[in-house]
Amino acid sequence: MLLSSCYYDTREAPEVPDIPDSEEISFSEDIQPILNQCTQCHNGSNANPDLREGSSYNALVPVYVEEGNAEGSLFYQKLPGVGHPFDVGFVLSADDIARIKTWIDRGADNN
């Protein structure tokens, strides 16, 4: 009898700072620069979703991002530092994760 299994190390989402309601979060100015760190792999050829500028919003919403629900969004669940399945050599800062979480929770606007 042969038994085998595999597992993924899972991480709890780090404590992320609250972003005040008065602070605007813009996809183009705040989120896309964070995503640009990921385009070595998420470039339309290697790994989905395509996170290159000009493609990323439509690749993310609504397939990977559930507008208004970061915790329920696959994209948020798989961020480096939260639960990315591979060691990508970096983790996002708590501030970057907070911006992404807030952007999704506020409706994931394409602004």
Model-derived regions, located:
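Aromatic- and Gly/Pro-enriched helix-to-coil junctions and flexible linker segments
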Residues: 6-111
